[in-house]
Amino acid sequence: MNEEYWILEVKVTPKSRENKIVGFEGEVLKIRVTEAPEKGKANEAVIALLAKTLSLPKRDVTLISGETSRKKRLLLPKSTESIISHWREHGL
């Protein structure tokens, strides 16, 4: 399977009250997760939340940079780009 991919920039707030996709700040998607930023738990929560929301298997959401930062870059299937663009333009 040779599907094209694109990069989504996200800003993560760990140790929040709930797992939630908040919305956009410019071109960056803001996400809150309940997990602490320890041993990759917050990263795993971000991947799980996006995968569930976009109806993707977790293996299709790949962290490519920002492993220890609040600002992260994720690789997503090209098929999700129109969904994310809709969120950006019309809200979640």
Swiss-Prot record:
SUPFAM superfamilies: YggU-like. Coiled coil: none annotated. InterPro entries: DUF167, YggU-like_sf. One of its GO terms (cellular component) is cytoplasm. NCBIfam families: DUF167 family protein, PRK00647.1. Belongs to the UPF0235 family. This is UPF0235 protein CCA_00247.
